[in-house]
């Protein structure tokens, strides 16, 4: 019995040893489970990436809106262009598989083509621009800009030089004109004094001669003034006008004396009797 008892603990110890050996073997199994989870997570992410290109592959059964609009305008052959309603009706009859938002998309594309100058809008209709009309306005626009830029500085320089010359010439001509008038007045006074003792008829003739003499030098100076500037001739004309008015006033009192008027009335009364 003692021998058996001694053998029992040995077996127990061996079992305990076995249990201690088995326990560390479970840990790598747990690590292996985690690796499986990571692989499954990676597998689920891959189909998401594959779904994105499937959306890009969707193709429309009809051509682009630009092609459809131009085809409608060409086939309709309207002189003043095709309206939006006519283009819409033509496309709907020709292409049956259109999206439900076709009318809105058509309007948006029409506005876009007009903005990009691929179509021309006339009132409420649309036309394809001709090759001549599209080519001619582009080179014409820069030529006009260059002409205006070159013409502006020349016009300003000419305008600045012209008034400067006109002012300088006006200042130079106004002063000698005043001197000439003063000289004419001085010459007229001594002649009037000499002829004071003579009868009235001679004095009138002398005054007219003095006016004629004073007017002659002014007449000679007028062409010189006219050659320099056009504004110089105007003061000469104004000075000559009062001389003529004075002569008219002197002749008027001589004509106002009418002696024959009472004689005519007497003759008419005699005829009535």
From Swiss-Prot:
Phosphoserine found at: 14
SUPFAM superfamilies referenced in this protein's UniProt entry, alphabetically: Winged helix' DNA-binding domain
Origin species: Arabidopsis thaliana (Mouse-ear cress)
GO MF term (any one): DNA binding
Record family assignment: Belongs to the histone H1/H5 family.
Modified residues (N-acetylserine): 2
PANTHER family listed in its UniProt record: HISTONE H1, HISTONE H1.2
UniProt region (Disordered), positions on chain: 1-63, 193-273
Name the record gives this protein: Histone H1.2
Stretches with biased composition (Low complexity): 193-216, 237-256
Residues annotated as domain H15: 61-130
Start-end of Basic residues biased regions: 33-59, 257-273
């Amino acid at each position: 019995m003692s021998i058996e008892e001694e053998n029992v603990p040995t077996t127990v110890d061996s079992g305990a040893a076995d249990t201690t050996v088995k326990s560390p073997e479970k840990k790598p199994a747990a690590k292996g489970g985690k690796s499986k989870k990571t692989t499954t997570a990676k597998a689920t992410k891959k189909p998401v990436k594959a779904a994105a290109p499937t959306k890009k592959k969707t193709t429309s059964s009809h051509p682009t809106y630009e092609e459809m609009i131009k085809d409608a305008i060409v086939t309709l052959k309207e002189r003043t262009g095709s309206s939006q309603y006519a283009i819409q009706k033509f496309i709907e009859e020709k292409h049956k598989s259109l999206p439900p938002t076709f009318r809105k998309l058509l309007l948006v594309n029409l506005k876009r083509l007009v903005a990009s100058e691929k179509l021309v809008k006339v009132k409420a209709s649309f036309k394809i621009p001709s090759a001549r009309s599209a080519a001619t306005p582009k080179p014409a626009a820069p030529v006009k800009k260059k002409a205006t830029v070159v013409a502006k500085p020349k016009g300003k320089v000419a305008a600045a030089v012209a008034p400067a010359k006109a002012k300088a010439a006006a200042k130079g001509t106004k002063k000698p004109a005043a001197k000439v008038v003063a000289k004419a007045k001085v010459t007229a006074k001594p002649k009037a004094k000499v002829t004071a003792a003579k009868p009235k008829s001679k004095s009138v003739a002398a005054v007219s001669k003095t006016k004629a003499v004073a007017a002659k030098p002014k007449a000679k100076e007028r062409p010189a003034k006219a050659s320099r500037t056009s504004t110089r001739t105007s003061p000469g004309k104004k000075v000559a006008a009062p001389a003529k008015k004075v002569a008219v006033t002197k002749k008027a009192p001589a004509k106002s004396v009418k002696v024959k008027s009472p004689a005519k009335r007497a003759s008419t009364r005699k005829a009535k009797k």
